[in-house]
Regions:
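Surface-exposed loop/turn segments and immediately adjacent short secondary-structure elements
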Residues: 1-171, 181-185
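Conserved catalytic palm subdomain of right-hand nucleotidyl-transferase polymerases, strongest
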Residues: 111-120, 158, 169-178, 219-263
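Conserved pre-motif C helix in the palm subdomain of viral-like polymerases
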Residues: 168-201, 217-223, 247-250, 302-335, ...
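Conserved polymerase palm-domain catalytic core
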Residues: 246-368, 387, 393-394
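Extended C-terminal regions of large enzymes
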Residues: 467, 491, 504-650, 654, ...
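Active-site metal-binding core of divalent-cation-utilizing nuclease and nuclease-like domains
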Residues: 645-649, 700-755, 799
Length: 845
């Protein structure tokens, strides 16, 4: 019975190991091929508790009620005539689509962006460049003859992603439409031309940052907003604000208004005719695919709203909203942003796509501005999402309650004391809520780092995932929230602590190495302090540049007296950036950590090759962290405990095995006589196995491949041209003491002999070991040359240090053996894996 229990335990352990190995391969393959999908699966792990789905008819009926029933805007609105009467807009000219236009459009689209019903990703259009001239010709023809638009070109495929756990409600889905790649390329060509026209004629309002190129988007708006709110608070000024949210803004714009606004801004009639014709053919089918449950609806005609999924839709929507900004600016109302006693700038609104924030000096002004906004919205048949609209009135530093009534009778609720509103990702009331926002960001950052560390990614992919999935949570807040250096250091410390918790980082390993590039001996984690400072400096430069042409930016610079993290009013502020060179200097100065830096920079060491295992990043995170701790010499040896951390319980630093010398990490990795014939020999033999098998395959002595740790070399392999000895004594005429090299290669035709000997010394013995091997087998080389009538006999030392340092001589040795120059990668990996195993085993004794 006990035997069965033991067998069951062994099988269970093997199964768990197999499952973990399979998961590791799958996750790393997914990460390398589709990083976005990996993150999506990571974020949804444990949250896919979706059970009930809406029926196909319910899904169809709900979304067709939004999209399929056309509405017309109020063509008689007075403001439309005023907007159309602008004389400073030059008519847009039409030019044929050129090959250069197609090249530019294809280059702007992600190679592997999900395709539509065509199932052809943009990658193939990029690679088949011979098609570009044909596409340019066809696109030009379609623009000039919209009646020839192929039916498939305007057919979308909409994936419905659940927004909440209530998956039975069809309204609780977010539609993501995938359009045919050809349609996206065509509309990208159109977008580039429309954008040039819009830019040249300065059509888009300065307050709109939703699709403006060369701007900072949400961050720019939030910085301006912060300066306004802080000035109002510091100077105890009255301020009234309103947050306006539209109900399904993109999905509710009438097609009649979309065409009308193109004509108002004098877009070329050929392009307008094409877009008008294509709108009549817009249609999409909805599909839901959750937990194996699949639903696909019939086609839904799009008769209202913008066909989302291409680069034209955001610009088109911004143009549709643009007259509102003219109307608001024409009121001459707003908050007066003071630069000095005699100069101010009136700001009435800020906008990012459909997120509108309105500013005024008092409640009467905010009422008037909201009335203007409501009138515009009513004329273009767009509705406020009143549950997400709020007003805030502050008089003499106090929040004044009082809802606002719109002309149509709807009420916008006023914010109460203690209530906050989420604007462009940050909670705010009278000011941005710094404490709550920081806490939320730090929690989200920690959750993402934790989910990454729980995965089975290899070390390189894991660190890359932290940089690309977790760090951006922080990056968005840089320049908006007031982060102190202490807080940023604490975030970096928290990251290292979490890595230590998951056995990916030794608690006393070098901190400097974590943020250095991998090719320079680091782990390439993002330096958050440097990133923060670079962002601040970049944003400051942006505002200064924009101030040359923008009165708003110029005013914000003058007003920002430590109101935002940028402190724009101070022209001398320049945050320090710690360079990699400075980090190397500090690393080299460390008493323990600096020893590896010294070894790495010796003239006989190939620095790039020595760091190749880090650059590849294919090891387990635990193994990588452990080896770096070995290199940093912070392993709990007796010498470290007695002489470095001064452990009072340690009375001697002698080796626990041989009791001869001090137990340093160098002694354990390559200096203890008691494990020379076991652990060191196994490590040495595995490197020999790699070289022997590669030579045997090269010379046709073997035609199979076996993992080096399972490979068992034969003492003699021979064919008509080559003979290969392994660990075999060479019988000589005169007595030669050192007559047993690891490998002997005899080339019968060339009459040459190579005496190959492998060694895995400590870092400080690499050069001495090479010279020792050359001297050791010189006598044997002479004897072999005379006995075997060889025209050429060479000694070829294969030296790799116990922690993976590669001497420059190894490249020459591999050339002599005619092996691929990257063979050192396998040798290095075998050496460091065995070293890690040896140290772990030794410390457990």
């Amino acid at each position: 019975m006990d035997l069965l229990r033991q067998k069951l335990k062994a099988k269970s352990k093997r199964l768990a190991r197999y499952v973990k190995c399979t998961k590791k391969k799958q996750q790393n393959h997914l990460f390398n091929t589709n990083e976005k999908l990996f993150y999506r699966q990571l974020s949804s792990a444990g949250t896919n508790n979706y059970h009930n789905l809406p029926s196909k008819d319910e899904l169809f009926d709900y979304w067709s009620s939004i999209w399929s029933y056309p509405q017309k805007h109020n063509e008689g609105a007075a403001w439309i005539e005023s907007e159309a009467g602008k004389s400073n807009i030059a008519p847009m000219m039409f030019d044929n689509i050129t090959t250069a236009d197609v090249n530019q459009a294809i280059g702007q689209i992600n190679s592997w962006k999900a395709p539509g019903i065509d199932n052809i990703q943009n990658f193939w259009y990029k690679k088949f460049s011979s098609l570009h001239e044909v596409l340019a010709s066809k696109f030009t023809h379609i623009l000039q003859h919209p009646e020839d638009i192929p039916a498939f070109l305007t057919h979308g495929l909409t994936h419905m992603l659940p927004k909440t756990a209530n998956t039975q409600d069809p309204s609780q889905y977010r539609p993501i439409t995938c359009l045919p790649t050809l349609y996206k390329i065509l509309t990208s060509c159109i977008t580039n031309r429309i954008y040039r026209h819009v830019d040249q004629n300065n059509i888009l309002a300065e307050e709109q940052k939703g699709c403006k190129r060369g701007h900072q988007g949400c961050k720019e708006q939030l910085i301006i907003d912060s300066v306004i709110l802080r000035q109002a608070q510091k100077q105890c000024r009255n301020i009234s604000t309103a947050f306006v949210d539209y109900r399904k803004a993109f999905d509710s714009v009438p097609h009649s208004w979309l065409i009308s606004v193109l004509n108002i801004y004098k877009i070329n009639p050929t392009i307008v005719s094409f877009l008008e014709a294509s709108m009549k053919q817009w249609r999409t089918s909805l599909q839901v695919n959750i937990n194996g449950q699949y639903i696909k609806t019939n086609d839904i005609s799009i008769r209202r709203g913008i066909f989302q999924g291409d680069s034209l839709s955001p610009l088109w929507f911004c143009l549709a909203m643009n007259p509102l900004f003219t109307m608001l600016n024409n009121t001459k109302l707003g908050f007066n942003l003071k630069i000095n006693k005699n100069t101010n700038c009136t700001v009435s609104h800020l906008l990012y796509m459909d997120d509108i924030k309105i500013f005024a000096s008092n409640q009467q002004q905010i009422q008037h501005l909201l009335d203007v906004t409501e009138r515009f919205s009513r004329d273009v048949r767009m509705q406020f999402g009143l549950d997400k609209c709020r007003t805030l009135n502050i008089e003499k530093g106090k929040i004044i309650n009082g809802d606002l009534a719109l002309p149509n009778g709807e009420i916008i609720a006023a914010m109460q004391n203690g209530e906050t509103y989420k604007y462009l990702g940050f909670q705010q009331a009278r000011l941005l809520d710094q404490k709550q926002s920081k806490s939320k960001i730090r929690n989200e950052f920690s959750q993402r780092v934790s989910s990454i560390l729980k995965s089975e990614l290899n070390a390189g992919n894991l660190n890359r995932a932290i940089n690309t999935y977790a760090v951006p949570v922080l990056t968005y807040s840089f320049g908006i929230l007031q982060w102190t250096k202490t807080e940023l250091e604490d975030i970096q410390r928290t990251t290292r602590t979490m890595m230590t918790k998951y056995r990916c980082h030794h608690p006393t390993s070098s901190v400097l190495r974590t943020t250095l590039p991998r090719k320079e001996g680091g782990r390439a984690l993002c330096d958050i302090i440097n990133l923060h400072n670079k962002q601040i400096n970049k944003l400051r430069d942006f505002f200064v540049t924009k101030s040359l042409s923008s009165n708003l930016h110029k005013s914000v610079i003058g007003a920002d007296k430590k109101y935002s993290p940028l402190n724009l009013a101070d022209p001398n502020m320049d945050l320090e950036i710690t360079t990699d060179a400075e980090k190397h200097v500090k690393w080299a100065q460390k008493a323990l950590h600096g020893r590896h830096h010294h070894d790495l920079n010796q003239p006989h060491i190939d620095k790039i090759a020595s760091n190749r295992w880090l650059a590849d990043g294919t090891l387990f995170p635990e193994t990588e962290g452990f080896l770096m701790a070995i290199q940093d010499q912070v392993i709990n040896t007796n010498n470290y405990k007695k002489c470095v951390i001064r452990d009072p319980t340690i009375t001697t630093d002698k080796c626990r095995r041989c009791q001869q010398t001090s137990e340093t990490i160098q002694h354990i990795t390559s200096g203890c006589s008691t494990i020379a014939n076991t652990d060191y020999l196994r490590r040495h033999n595995q490197l020999c196995n790699i070289v022997h098998q590669k030579l045997a395959n090269k010379y046709g002595l073997l035609n199979t491949y076996t993992p080096y740790y399972k490979y068992n070399p034969k003492a003699v392999l021979e064919n008509a041209d080559f003979r290969l000895y392994y660990d075999r004594s060479i019988i000589t005429d005169r007595q030669v003491t050192n007559n047993r090299p690891d490998i002997v290669v005899v080339d019968k035709k060339a009459k040459s002999v190579l005496l190959v000997d492998v060694a895995v010394p400590n870092n400080n013995n690499v050069l001495d070991k090479y010279n020792e091997k050359m001297a050791k087998y010189t006598d044997l080389a002479i004897e072999v040359g005379q006995m075997w009538h060889a025209e050429k006999v060479e000694v070829v030392p294969i030296i790799v240090s116990s922690t993976g340092l590669i001497p420059k001589s190894l490249e020459d040795s591999l050339k002599k053996l005619d092996l691929h120059k990257n063979t050192f990668i396998d040798l290095q990996k075998a050496a460091i894996l065995n070293t890690c195993h040896t140290v772990r085993k030794f410390l457990n004794m």
